[in-house]
């Protein structure tokens, strides 16, 4: 996590502004191909293709935000630091890719055998307050109580 607390612009407001971006229509045209690439990557167990596609999509999502009217800048210096670190790790041979939703925090995916090295590297970055580890779930589960 590079930032804790509410975003400067809510996701709802960001969605409303997305259509003001001159790149919005083109992004919509690209989505079917991207979905196909994600599906094929999952079916083929091609982690590198999956990672590259979701990273591409995240960058385009933020391109739309940054080019909306008025522009939305979710990224922080910490976001850029993590994005660069992930790219460097990949160049060093660690298979990791980044993705982001609307906000400053970067989500990083990797294979289980790379997790410890990835977490060590991310935790060493000055802008990273802490790392939340996640894993693949066993599937949906009905709960008797709400989580909150």
Feature-to-residue mapping (PLM):
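C-terminal nucleotide
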Residues: 1-148
């Amino acid at each position: 996590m590079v930032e804790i607390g509410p975003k400067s612009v809510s996701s709802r407001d960001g969605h409303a502004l997305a259509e003001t971006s001159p790149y919005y229509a083109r992004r919509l045209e690209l989505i079917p191909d991207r979905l196909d690439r994600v599906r094929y990557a999952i079916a083929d167990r091609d982690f590198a293709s999956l990672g590259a596609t979701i990273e591409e999509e995240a960058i385009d999502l933020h391109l739309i935000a940054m080019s909306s009217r008025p522009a939305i800048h979710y990224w922080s210096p910490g976001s850029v630091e993590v994005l660069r670190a992930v790219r460097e790790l990949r160049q060093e041979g660690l298979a990791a890719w980044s993705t982001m939703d609307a906000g400053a925090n970067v989500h990083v995916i990797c294979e289980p055998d790379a997790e410890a090295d990835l977490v060590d590297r991310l935790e060493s970055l000055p802008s990273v307050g802490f790392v939340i580890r996640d894993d693949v779930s066993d599937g949906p589960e009905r709960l008797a109580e709400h989580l909150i």
